[in-house]
Amino acid sequence: MTTTPELLAPAGDEECMIAAVNAGADAVYFGLRDGFNARARAANFATEELPRVFDYLHAHGVRGFVTFNTLVFDSELALAEKTLQAIARAGGDAIIVQDLGVAKLAHEVCPQLALHASTQMTVSSPEGARVAASLGVTRVVVPRELSVEEIARFSAGTDLELECFVHGALCMSWSGQCLTSEALEARSANRGQCAQSCRLPYDLYVDGGRRDLGDVKYLLSPKDLAAYALLPELLKAGICSFKLEGRMKGVEYVTNIVDKYRRALDHALNTNAKGLDANDEQELRLTFSRSFGPGFLKGSDHQTLVHGKYPGHRGLEVGRVERVEQSRGYVYVNAVPDAPALFPGDRVLFDQQRPEENEPRGSLFGVDDLGKGQLKLVFGGEEAGRRGSGADLDRVRVGDVVYKSRDIALARKLKRIAETERKLAIDVQVSGRVGELLQVTARDVLGRSAQTQSALPLAAATSRPLDRALITEKLCAFGESPFELRTLSVDLEGAVAISPSELKRMRRALTDALTEQQTPRAPREVTSARALSRFSVSEAASRPLLIPLLRTIEQVDRAIAMKDELGLVDIELDFMELVGLGVAVERVRAAGLKVIIATPRVQKPGEEGYDRRFRKLAPDGILARHLGAVEHFRHDGEGRLHGDFSLNATNARTALTLLDLGLTTLTPAYDLDATQLLALCEGVPASKLEVTVHQHLPLYHTEHCVYSHTLSKGKDFRTCGRPCEEHLIHLQDTQGLQHPVIVDVGCRNTVFNAKAQSAASVIGKLLNANVRRYRVELVRETTDETAHVLTAYRELIDGHIDARTAVKRASAIEKYGVTSGTLHVVTA
């Protein structure tokens, strides 16, 4: 357990790791090349390097955490176990994990290996933390969507350590709940392959018409988080680890953020330490920023979280282009007040309000201050004979905004910090009296200690006596050694004398003794996990169920009218804003059907009232979409609790873990393809699975409200005027697809895929595997469309039509047709 606040730094490669250590990190986190980490495109580390990596970190008093924060498939569990064993044996301090089954697996393999729940696990409340703790988790990385106040509530309700991101890129979607890359790019963010779809431009459509927003095009691209000023508040709220994002960034960026946040955290812990000033913030902006903000830590502000003008790095604004002399390599700029100074070697960028294109940028050969706020920037030019890394001036236009994007002097300073080896702090105690040997003890931050004594007894001083200043100068001047003095305790009786050369000899004896001591690896018991049973397919005893998941009262009425034709037993209700939910429950119950209510996708501290509202409606079951709901409802009685896709079960260990928590049925995660889904059916009783066979995949699930941002001036639900009650927004992507945006009871937005996805082609194999529950999800389909889709899948399940016919019939009502999705389904 962490006893003092920790600065946790990213390391995408070894150079960044060394830089983070030298810049002052208390711990670093990194991923492995074997996979299982959410930054698959980073250089990462080889598993066989782990002993050397941890030895290096521990020798510098730094902890090392391995990211294991992706979902794992059944075919990968053996490698996952082997990798976890290697991490434990190498001396890893913790793993950061997303997959619930992997957390349980790691705890079986090595109980002494600390488990940290990644933001990808979506542990957003104390109730969810209790589930995580039951699997062996000791720390939760809180979601970026929580405010300081909500974090304080979280902390008050759990004994687990809490870790918080304080700097870096923000995801638009709740971590672990983003399916955009999966749906649109066939690469899963839950597998470390995020396609950065939130950084793309989107057109806004309101009630079917395009709304012109000028240069605001990046509606889902948040500013970067910069919370250095909030560290004191976060400390009071209960945060023990302050996490910096950036495993995909380079060494300059890592050095800069660690150096700055080291000082900011030291200042938060001791106000006598120097904090950050305006120049420090400018330096943070120069290594990377999309503009800075507090994220959600100060609560929701939908007007400032996203500016929408650009998705990438800018830096510091210099001014606007007034004139270009291309052949001479000159660009004349009208500078803004307080424009940053420019020097040869600095890089600038020309913002042309088309960031999706390759914007002109380059390094400066020279800068002339012409006075009255006018600058002449000198680049390469044919006429001037300057060649090299100049900007592409033929694309620079009058009016372009000029940004300073890199500072060469800052780069040199950061290089020195990154390459200056970090020293270990040691505490020294000195004692002695006349006629006795001088005794010296030193202890470093790793707990290693060494003692030495003078060769001869101390004599009475006849000139300068031994004092604190002389001890500091001769005994504690550790110079080129890997140590530096932290505290000095002196206990001398009387005026004693010793030669400076003897003090130097004793210093060398101390440093040699400490250096020779190897940092011991804590003894650990590493075992193999118990094998899982394989489940045989038993003969089906009942007609497979079609389970409609409905979102409007009109859909409910139509489904009830067709209940006998469709063979309905259960209806799942996902009334996202809860409006009309009570009426729908009554109608389903009056029709003699069982009603299952879906919870919101996430629940934050202070939102427990939703669960009480659901319980008051007395449904036949709850469709739990977050771990807090699992904890809240799992003691309500057998048969009442169903787990949804958002619990992210992609392997048998995770599925069985969730079923052991009290779930009656479970919908597998949408990251599985057909082969993986069928493999899951072999490791879990297939009768316990509910498979979604038709849906509009929920791409993003966001705390940010597009309605509030674009259709109001309000910053949150209290001031936005609720435009979501009067309008329907679609976001049109670069392919021309218009994705509907639906608001839930927590004012969170779900962006649904414009295209429907079908699993029709695998239904036959699922039936053979004894899967009995088949869900069809609707979003805003009309009553006729509801009947059309439900009938097609009922007939397919009953064997009256084939998969191709079912898909063709489902496609008939879809504007963009039906896609195969990840299950490789046949299409019409």
How would you describe each model-predicted region?
Residues 107:
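Short glycine-biased active-site loop of nucleotidyltransferases that positions the nucleotide triphosphate
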Residues 1-23, 27-40, 53-54, 60-70, ...:
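Surface-exposed amphipathic alpha-helical tracts and adjacent flexible/coil segments at the periphery
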Residues 110:
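Conserved phosphotransfer cores of two-component systems
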Residues 45-51:
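Glycine-rich, highly charged phosphate/nucleotide-binding loops
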Residues 123-125, 226-227:
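Active-site glycine-rich loop that binds ribose-phosphate moieties when present
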